[in-house]
């Protein structure tokens, strides 16, 4: 029986191999186009990578000359960081100053008496207030722990309640204000006051003491060389004429009570010229006598003290002195309380006994020649009493922060003070034992890190440009930081764009920029990149011969120079990388500015790289269409060959069958004879 031949299955005549060999020749154009497509895609990806590297460099250099450049950053250090620290702004002056913390700002923190662990809080409308902030809620009664949770849910950033366990069966309730400052007193109203009284948290304030601070004529005395006898007393105020003053003792009982505060207002008022006291003695008139039409005058007094020419010709210079109010300490030191307002408005003063331990007297000095000082009569206040109630177990009472700066005592309601030292925020944590020195210095570490980042990104871009524009294998082997995979990938890109003059020109421009001179001020010490410790040969000193790697444009860092330069030349380094040469407040020169502008032509929308990738997009689309056309033709060609060879194989099989039939017939005929 003849073999059954099925085209494409038994492949009796090796037609599949014939078709395959024929199709390989037909696939040459397709293979060539596919390789070209891969080349286009690789080039496009490479251009995108170059764009990324250039963008990294642009971001790095922009940070060196932008508004938030690291050369303007400041750091503050304190000799007593646990008591006072500082946070400088970028515009803060480079200086050192002393700050003494006399007192930190505190908030009211009131404890109850010991309470039973199973105590129930009665129902009612509970109202708490801290200055003008109020917390009010209706409580239906229940456990103390539930009451505390309900209060805390409604009083965020105003007050806080907590339970302190004293023993197994005893506990205490703590309610505290979250707002510091002497004016931010914690007060209770409605059921809250009743509950505070019930738990022994507050009690009624005692009657006011009779020994409040008053100023009396028979108790004041001269202030230095200023006469106190000219001081005028009225029902509500005291008037201190020019060139006068007084010192009034403060009762020891008031000075010893830390909750007592003395308050009063003072203002300086201009007086008419005719009321100004004369600078020299004036003798009265000698007198006259008249009778009818005759008038006789007495002879003028002769003191036998002739005036000097200087006294006769030079009038006294007017004096303006707004430092008028002082507190006298026990050791005799006079502490100024702040100047008067020059516009005649009242200046309010508060003297807290807790702020001036051991104070002995209030001193008023009027050194002015054309102003009188008017002072309201002082009032003595017990700051612990609030609405007639005082805390019975205060863990802490509200008080202002108090510091001494430049010899002036300053009070603020918060421990964060940003309006005393220009562009510097003081952070108060604790009282200082002695004045702390705060130094404002440049942030040299931030500047150094920014420069190192710039060098790293610049060198990475320069390495990529060298790989793409040259064909020397040593360019890759010199890059020791490359991993094995990165080195293999770089080998595929080696010399890919060696005919791209835009990249070669861009590389030369970068080298010119980093090696150029940028004069700014006449006395600038650093006008070139290499003087700051960054150059193509920074790691060596002196001439060491020509090195091929140093001719490729990589930057090196001399860390000693880089550490030393910002110490005394931070402004020069800032100007080196970005400088306003024409005074229009816009940076228009410097290394960072020039690099940014140079790379902008590559990375901007419609720039060199965008143009290259756009062209490649067009080529990729065209190549993909060509591939689709070629693949379609090849499929038809292959199908046509399979059909023709199948028909040929079928014909051969048919002929073979006919041949077999004839052979069989002949064999049968011979065997029949």
From Swiss-Prot:
PANTHER family: FLAGELLAR CAP/ASSEMBLY PROTEIN FLID, FLAGELLAR HOOK-ASSOCIATED PROTEIN 2. Residues 649-673 are annotated as: Disordered. Its main location: periplasm. InterPro entries: FliD, FliD_C, FliD_N. It holds the Pfam family FliD_N. Required for the morphogenesis and for the elongation of the flagellar filament by facilitating polymerization of the flagellin monomers at the tip of growing filament. Forms a capping structure, which prevents flagellin subunits (transported through the central channel of the flagellum) from leaking out without polymerization at the distal end. This is Flagellar hook-associated protein 2. One of its GO terms (cellular component) is bacterial-type flagellum hook. Residues 611-664 form a coiled coil. Keywords: Bacterial flagellum, Coiled coil, Periplasm. It comes from the Bacteria. Belongs to the FliD family. It comes from Treponema maltophilum. It is found in: Periplasmic flagellum; Periplasm. GO terms for biological process: bacterial-type flagellum-dependent cell motility; cell adhesion. Homopentamer. The keyword Ion transport does not apply. The gene is fliD. Residues 650-673 have a biased composition (Polar residues).
